[in-house]
Amino acid sequence: MTPRRQQRPKGQLAKAKQAKQPLARSRRPRRRRRAAITQNNLMMLSEPGLSFLKCAFASPDSNTDPGKGIPDNFEGKVLSQKNVYTETGVNFSGATTQNVDTYIIVLPTPGVAFWRCIKTATAPAQPAALTTTDVFTAVPFPDFTSLFGTTATNRADQVAAFRYASMNFGLYPTCNSTQYNGGISVWKGAVQMSTTQYPLDTTPESSQLVHAITGLESALKVGDENYSESFIDGVFTQSINGNAEFPFYPILEGVQTLPGQNVTVAQAGMPFSLDAGAATVAGFTGIGGMDAIFIKVTAAAGSVNTATIKTWACIEYRPNTNTALYKYAHDSPAEDIIALQQYRKVYKSLPVAVRAKLNANMWERVKRLLKAGLVAASYVPGPVGGIATGVQHIGDLIAELSF
């Protein structure tokens, strides 16, 4: 016989229910306290912080506002800019009998949109790999001379230092989908400036200060972490600051080529050279703390590969006090820890590159990452969790500032 389950007497059951009620009530004040977190605490993700994120990640198709600057612990006058370069009808194809490889490097060089080198070979041969004899030429932003002048020795007359928030590059095909033939590969790599005192074989003996860029060897081979697609898919990619801080870097003067005169590419330890061209058009103004973006576009003989190139950079300068630009400078925004944390989160979350058509939704993707990050932060104990709790208000703030 199956034993009967013992049942609690009705009186005891009622007492048990009554005993649970105070526990349920005790949770309510905590919920009320969470809901009552003031808007001031939530504003730790500030409007300048959101403007900084928008400048760094949003396409200038919608907004070219450079924001208020980078909201870190720097205190001083800054000049924020969002430089934009657009080139339409770019032909990546060669003659009907030529295979063409176009190399583009987006470097953190103020005033320069990107550096380009084109290599060709008569079909069926493929273009040779990059060597020390190859030269990358500068493609400047339209306002280069207004900020850096027309002589190499006066580059720092207006601004003394700079730092980047982001660099962005987009290639948008405009050719017929039945006529193209080729592909696009994108990868990234660390680059840095090196400066050495190089001895010269002269009488009497002398030396020369030589600038060079280390890390350009990454351009010689497609990196393991890469984006590779058909040319017709295009590409959008960006680089942001992965360093712990946002240091300023000096504007260089008197540099038009890397390496400089009297020093060979091999002696400087570079895989190829950079040439900014005429000083009245462009120049080499320095290297910031961002990873370089390497792009290789291939086109087969007889193909019709045309596209629009659009690149932009969110950058901050320290203007000289004796210039007219100084009156347009503003105080660097107060530190916004939440905005900087979300900037790092986006840095870790975004892929090397995406298809060009996905660029239109870039800011929407960033907003989703922001909301997800703030939701996760609301479960963190301490001040960060307290600030992030009530994420619905942050979402409303983001929505108000969205495009």
Swiss-Prot record:
Q: Which species is this record about?
A: Boolarra virus (BoV)
- What positions does the entry give for Ca(2+) 5 binding? E245
Q: Where does Ca(2+) 3 bind?
A: D157, E217
Keywords on record: Aspartyl protease, Calcium, Capsid protein, Disulfide bond, Hydrolase, Metal-binding, Protease, T=3 icosahedral capsid protein, Viral penetration into host cytoplasm, Viral penetration via permeabilization of host membrane, Virion, Virus entry into host cell
Among Pfam families, the record links this protein to:
Peptidase_A6
Q: Where does Ca(2+) 1 bind?
A: D157
Query: What is this protein's record name?
Result: Capsid protein alpha
Q: Provide the residue span(s) of the region labelled Disordered.
A: 1-32
Give the EC number.
Answer: 3.4.23.44
Q: Report the GO molecular function annotations.
A: aspartic-type endopeptidase activity; metal ion binding
Q: Which SUPFAM superfamilies match?
A: Positive stranded ssRNA viruses
Task: Provide the disulphide bond pattern.
Answer: C55-C314
The active-site annotation reads D61
Question: What is a biological process (GO) this protein takes part in?
Answer: symbiont entry into host cell via permeabilization of host membrane
